[in-house]
């Protein structure tokens, strides 16, 4: 049996930002602690995975050595956006492209690898996002979370967060919809309106 394993390398500041906690702007990080632990576990298990890296973390010089160690130990790296905003799907196409490109460059600078895989923060995706990824020659996107419990996950998140009513409104599609629970669990291909099958 074949399996694909990946990990979203969401840093401390990204959780603080999404939850509405003060102090995230100083980008507190625990990457220097958790990445070596993950890598040691994966070495012991003799498995290689894909780490989806947030561009903002890769842009911070103090994180570059630990992010480079991911590639040095034989793992793949993917793009997890630059700003890790779970409302990415609400961005204009131009803003999405800027977000993807900015993360690509930061991840390349930190790791020496170009990204060809993407996962949206908070499993955020849109047709515009997929078209941007296609244009930029990405080979796969893992932003879709095919589960029926997305609305429950979102409500729990709102309950536990310190977000204002307006912030909650901007995140109302976080984790996807009930309808997305009907998408396949195995890889599949998107066909865009301007494409032929």
Predicted segment positions?
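Active-site beta->alpha N-cap acidic-glycine motif
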Residues: 1-73
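Active-site-adjacent pocket scaffolds in enzyme catalytic domains
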Residues: 113, 120-197
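Amphipathic alpha-helical segments that form well-ordered structural scaffolds
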Residues: 34-37, 41, 102, 106, ...
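Short, hinge-like loop/turn segments at secondary-structure boundaries
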Residues: 23-24, 68-70, 95-97, 134, ...
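Generic detector of short, locally flexible boundary/turn motifs and exposed helical patches
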Residues: 14-18, 42-45, 81-85, 106-108, ...
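Residue-level recognition of hydrophobic positions within alpha-helical transmembrane segments
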Residues: 4-7, 95, 137
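Metal-dependent polysaccharide deacetylase catalytic core of the NodB/CE4 family, i.e.
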Residues: 45-128, 139, 143-154, 196
């Amino acid at each position: 049996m074949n399996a694909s394993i990946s990990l979203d390398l969401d840093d401390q500041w990204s959780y603080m930002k999404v939850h509405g906690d003060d102090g995230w702007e100083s980008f507190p990080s625990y990457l220097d602690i958790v990445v070596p632990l993950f890598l040691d576990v994966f070495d012991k298990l003799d498995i290689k995975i894909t780490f989806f890296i947030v561009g903002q973390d890769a842009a911070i010089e103090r994180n570059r050595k630990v992010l480079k160690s991911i590639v040095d130990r034989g793992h793949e790296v993917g793009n997890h956006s630059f700003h890790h905003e779970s409302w990415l799907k609400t961005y204009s196409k131009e803003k999405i492209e800027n977000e993807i490109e900015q993360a690509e460059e930061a991840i390349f600078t930190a790791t020496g690898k170009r990204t060809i895989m993407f996962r949206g923060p908070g499993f955020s995706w849109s047709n515009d996002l997929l078209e941007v990824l296609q244009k930029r020659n990405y080979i796969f996107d893992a932003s879709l979370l095919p589960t029926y419990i997305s609305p429950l996950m979102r409500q729990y998140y709102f309950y536990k967060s310190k977000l204002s009513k307006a912030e909650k409104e901007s995140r109302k599609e976080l984790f996807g919809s009930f309808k997305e629970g009907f998408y396949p669990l195995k890889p599949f291909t998107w066909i865009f309106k301007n494409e032929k099958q």
